[in-house]
Amino acid sequence: MAENKTENPGTEEMEVRLAQLNQFTRRTLTQEEVFLFDVRLCDNEIDRDGERFSLEALEQLKTLFVGKTGIFDHNPKGENQTARLYAAELVQDPERITAAGEVYTFLKGHAYMVRTDANRDLIREIDGGIKKEVSISCAAASQTCSVC
């Protein structure tokens, strides 16, 4: 889920975010050149396939996602590359308990896009809440049944 909660952070916070995202750029980008938004990448709730990420897996993914490119339709063609994750953090909601009995925890990715004429409509759709879902693709080395 895309959440545009980072568009107008304070000056100090913006400097930190710009420093983080500029680690992935060929030149230093300014606040005016980028669009910042947050995405809910994955969580520890049981999904439609009866699977969930453990808290340990979410912690590992937190570092693995940084620097990854956001693409459309799980298709890595160049023209489908849209955004890049420059930071990630785990967020807990102590008021929400998962079906597995844990405090609901999700991995929030902080993403940026370079503002261009070509993505102006996409930015408006993200701001307007139209484009808000994201999907991640991954493969697990093993699965552990929580019942057996």
What is each residue range found by the language model?
Residues 1-148:
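Signature of dsDNA virion morphogenesis modules
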